[in-house]
């Protein structure tokens, strides 16, 4: 990883966090929120591959939760969004079909990850309640 990549990843993390904090929609049923962080994660993964997706996904997911007052989700967001960025970045450069498969798999990882994180923190009803919001968050 070069200094140039570190600088670009840092800028993408900052942009993703700023965008997410600008559009932050609380979801009382899950004790969480919906943001636009996927835009930054998928953009970085598409442009810079799996390492960029992993770095921006993990760091921005963690920072968004800590800054917005949801620290209980921070470690889960670090892991889930990092894996989401890694997977989507892995498939991004191969072909258009592969890129779309990466987006679908990244969405699946995020939705299932937060289903289990919600279950761990608050029980199954919270985990299940997170599915529609997380699907919308990924589609937007």
Protein language model features and the residues they cover:
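Loop-helix junctions at membrane interfaces
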Residues: 1-140
């Amino acid at each position: 990883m070069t200094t140039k990549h570190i600088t670009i990843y840092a800028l993408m993390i900052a942009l993703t966090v700023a965008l997410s904090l600008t559009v932050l929609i609380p979801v009382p049923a899950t004790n969480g929120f919906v943001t636009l962080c996927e835009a930054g994660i998928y953009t970085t993964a598409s442009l810079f591959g799996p390492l960029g997706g992993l770095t921006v996904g993990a760091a921005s997911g963690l920072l968004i939760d800590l800054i917005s007052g949801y620290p209980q989700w921070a470690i889960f967001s670090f892991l889930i969004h990092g894996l989401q960025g890694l997977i989507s970045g892995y498939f991004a450069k191969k072909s258009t079909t592969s890129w779309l498969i990466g987006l679908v798999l990244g969405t699946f990882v995020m939705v299932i990850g937060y289903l289990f994180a919600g279950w761990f923190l608050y029980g199954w009803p919270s985990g299940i309640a997170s599915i529609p919001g997380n699907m919308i968050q990924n589609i937007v």
